[in-house]
From Swiss-Prot:
Reaction(s) this enzyme catalyzes, per UniProt: RX + glutathione = an S-substituted glutathione + a halide anion + H(+); androst-5-ene-3,17-dione = androst-4-ene-3,17-dione; pregn-5-ene-3,20-dione = progesterone
PANTHER family linked to this entry: GLUTATHIONE S-TRANSFERASE, GLUTATHIONE S-TRANSFERASE A3
Quaternary data: Homodimer.
EC assignment: 2.5.1.18
Keywords: Acetylation, Cytoplasm, Lipid metabolism, Transferase
Subcellular locations according to the entry: Cytoplasm
Protein name: Glutathione S-transferase A3
Positions that bind glutathione: Y9, R45, Q54, V55, Q67, T68
Gene: GSTA3
Location of the GST N-terminal domain: 3-83
GO CC annotation terms, alphabetical: cytosol; extracellular exosome
GO MF: glutathione transferase activity
Amino acid sequence: MAGKPKLHYFNGRGRMEPIRWLLAAAGVEFEEKFIGSAEDLGKLRNDGSLMFQQVPMVEIDGMKLVQTRAILNYIASKYNLYGKDIKERALIDMYTEGMADLNEMILLLPLCRPEEKDAKIALIKEKTKSRYFPAFEKVLQSHGQDYLVGNKLSRADISLVELLYYVEELDSSLISNFPLLKALKTRISNLPTVKKFLQPGSPRKPPADAKALEEARKIFRF
């Protein structure tokens, strides 16, 4: 029997959080090996564990996978969260790439200069309301089904609900005019595996604060 997937990253959201979400939603228990210093990261680099000298890295099925999207694709395929055929996978890819664009803006927000932060938040809110939320509301409206693709849970639904929580942290009113997105968030959040992940004490990570940001700076030296 294969061991649990082992996640190598620092103790924060960053680019590992979507992987945590997807594994949790699939009902997969995993271990986390936190990188606590630049020396820890250097050791992984020096022993050949990181193909491109970068994390996240996930040990799974005898592999040391890097690159967030590659890891997500593998997990989604392994746990039947990637559609039934090539057309459904194309839709899932298209939707998740769109989500990734907005998620990247939110991910980088703590790194911006203080004098730029308000403008960045305003831009995120504007794009959320005018571009991203309307697009996904329209998808759900177009087929009247419970999930984005094939009327079956996929990584696209998990990624979207993760994103909805992040947007809610910025401004909880942004979702108010999108009833189908609200319903999707409730539906996915009530799945037993996701509900467990949303509880206190789970591997889910909180928003980055000044302490977490300083820790990341020391590890990654940016």
